[in-house]
Amino acid sequence: GSAIARELMRKKRNIAVLERCSDICEGTSKANSGIVHAGFDATPGTLKAKMNVQGSRMMEALSKELDFFYKRNGSLVLCFNEADRPKLELLLEKAEKNGVEGCEIISGDEVRQMEPQVSEQVVAALYAPAGGIVCPF
């Protein structure tokens, strides 16, 4: 709500943000894990796909402007057997349709070079360098 209000105020709109509880963020609609999604999993052509990609692209500049922690650390979707590799290929296809840049399918060995503690059972992964994290608190 506050990010939407901020953007509307920049367009000279009169805005009020109302909180349901006695303190801010007590009435969140679901949860906040601090993940900035790259947008590879959203159904192509949906508003969610558009907003995931656009929001991810905006986050670095916004974090500098508003002075909050943000790290573009990328994300991995792990594949533990060859039978599941088509699922990675489907995610890669969605990523391309959604305009997520830099996604690729990498080998299990490449995953372990990035994250040495990853299980030896991992055979491949979708790597999305646009994924990131923020501190939600």
Model-derived features: where do they sit?
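Glycine-rich FAD pyrophosphate-binding loop
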Residues: 9-31
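Structural motif
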Residues: 15-16, 34, 124-125
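Helix-loop-beta segment of a Rossmann-like dinucleotide-binding subdomain
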Residues: 69-78, 112-137
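Proline-centered flexible-loop/turn and helix-kink motifs
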Residues: 11-13, 64, 116
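Dinucleotide-binding Rossmann-like beta1-alpha1 core, especially the glycine-rich loop
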Residues: 34-114
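Residues forming the Rossmann-fold NAD(P)(H) cofactor-binding site
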Residues: 2
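Short, conserved glycine- and acidic-residue-centered signature motifs
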Residues: 29, 52, 135-136
